[in-house]
Amino acid sequence: MKLGINIDHIATLRNARGQGNPSILRALKVCEKAKVDTLTVHLREDRRHINDNDLKLLKKNARIPINLEMALTDEMIAISKRIKPNFICLVPENRNEITTEGGLNLEKISKKKLKSLLTVCHSNGIELSAFINPNKKAIELAKKFKFQTVELHTGSLDKKKINNRDKENINNMINFASKMNLKVNIGHGLNFSNIKFIKSRKKIDTVHIGHFIISEAIFLSLHETIKKFQRII
């Protein structure tokens, strides 16, 4: 598996003081030195953490691929056309949420906007994925709507007592998506402990980690936390 690091919460910490520290460009350089495979940022409608200038700076300076998480809106489609990230992952957004609470409901998305985004992606060599719940219906819809990749929501593993049904389901859905000829990524709530429940690792392209990595970095340093996770996967 490859490792993608989400640095949104470095921007959250920076924004708490409204100045320039901690620097997202410094975080980028640490990630590159640690040989991270992908850098992920979520440009939210409310600009809660990453902002437009951050995205420009990262795209200009990054030597590793940029994965842009975004909602399916006209504004974000225009931004993606201008910035041209390497990857785009469509995610749900709710202004009142603390973090992403579940996968994107593909039945309810605008097919007109999706068609527009697919045109942007095809014209610029951008790989498009959808962040979805780990169930067959969502995976089948992703295939139907011509997504190249799915990122399966692993939040069911982020609790003190994880039941066997959740462990089995996420692994079964990884295998199911792979059989549908979709590239499979996973993310949300993963840490040093629960990543061990992911058994179908050969079917996974990239595991995306954000909040946990940044939290552990307070104690271990960002570089050492990344290296430890790489050793585990």
Q: Which ranges hold each PLM region?
A:
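Catalytic cores of alpha/beta
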Residues: 74-84, 135-145, 184-186, 190-204
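Alpha-helix-loop-beta-strand connector modules within alpha/beta enzyme cores
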Residues: 48-74, 107-129, 164-188, 192, ...
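Hydrophobic faces of well-ordered beta-strands that scaffold small-molecule active sites
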Residues: 3-7, 39-41, 66-70, 88-90, ...
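Histidine/lysine/aspartate-rich catalytic loop segments that bind and position anionic ligands
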Residues: 127-176
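C-terminal helical cap(s) of enzyme catalytic domains, especially alpha/beta-barrels
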Residues: 59, 102, 162-163, 215-233
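Glycine-rich phosphate-binding active-site loops on the catalytic face of alpha/beta enzymes
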Residues: 89-97, 148-160, 203-222
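Conserved N-terminal beta1-alpha1 strand-loop-helix module at the mouth
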Residues: 1-85, 141-144, 162-165
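Glycine-enriched alpha-helix->loop->beta-strand junction motifs that scaffold or abut catalytic
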Residues: 35-37, 61-64, 82-88, 123, ...
